[in-house]
């Protein structure tokens, strides 16, 4: 039984008792002697009344129950809403706490990583400092050894000078004796005897001086060459330079041979427009699916190649479109050139160079000297000079700066005309470069003396970069003319029987007439020939001069 049924029964029982009592109170006789029996009508009325009361009670109970139920539902709903709200807030709080914990964990992890990174950085710095300290100690020991060597050289030179002085005294004594002997013989006049003695003494002194000079020079060369090779080897072993290749043509692949006719155009209008705007020659031959771009200017070739590739990809090839594409590519290449210069400056860690020089530095990438890319050559010179400066304790940054800019005039020398050194000096002054850079621009072609030690390193690095095997190449005609000119210069000296340029012009062997040239004169000739070659011939790298004097004595056994 549910609660409603129980309530209805209780209400019905109560109503019945109440009605019965009312009925009994109204119908009771004053003093009856017998128990009256209610009539059916009365019972029917009581029953009807009871049913009404029960019905009203039931309705009231339903209303009360409904209100109680609604109130209970409302309370439950509010409780559920509050519970959901509390649960949601609790979940949000949990999520927030989780996020906070994760964030804290992440921060702690980042801090730990930063601390570890700093520790590793400090360890590397400490190792570098220890290594640098060892290098400095090693360098200090080497310098001390070098100082001791210098002191020994000075002692040897002083000893040689004393020997030379003693020899001069002996010569003077010999002159006096010969003069007395000549006067005694009286066959010559005093003046003639004096001239004869002077001639003999000069020859003897010249021979002795040449011998002494050779000994001192060979010793100094040997020691200096050892130190120089050591420094140069340390600098150059860290480079991987490129081999020069002389390209004057570039090829562009075509989707099909049909494009050759479209590139030529009606009556050749397209190809003429393209060649006029780009300054190159388009070679269209029987080679399948290939067009060749020919020009001695690398920048023009690159612009023409890019423009032609865009025209082929676009498919619209006519004079107006060609002009539009070529102009667009030229504008893009100006920015590309500046970007190349900027990247080069940052690669060499020269951030304080005036941005106005970026364009000229980038333009060196499209210039060549003896088929060697000028920008790559300048970077190579900068690296070698900087490394040698570090080895010698000089300003490595200044050496790299001067090395990079020593050929900056070549960027526009073909446009303005004139010497690239003068143009380079003008650019360096315009953009506020230091005096050492200007000195390097002039001194590497010996137009002015070297005034800074870093500039001397730049000149040496320039010679190394140009002289290494594979660095530069010449055209065949220029190469042959240079070898012929080299042999002509050598043959112009008196006593030279023949001359042979070998090793691709990097060595010349001089055969002298032994009857006209003595050993001492051959030695002096080996000094004079290189000077004249430097004055009259323009050549890459260096040329070794070998003077050969051969004496043959032939006899026959009979």
Swiss-Prot record:
UniProt keyword terms in alphabetical order: Cell membrane, Endonuclease, Hydrolase, Membrane, Nuclease, RNA-binding, Transmembrane, Transmembrane helix
Transmembrane segments: 3-23
Compartment(s): Cell membrane
BP terms from Gene Ontology: mRNA catabolic process
Listed EC numbers: 3.1.-.-
Superkingdom as given in the UniProt entry: Bacteria
SMART domains: HDc, KH
Residues in HD domain copies: 374-467
Function recorded in the entry: Endoribonuclease that initiates mRNA decay.
Protein name: Ribonuclease Y
Organism ancestry: Bacteria, Pseudomonadati, Aquificota, Aquificia, Aquificales
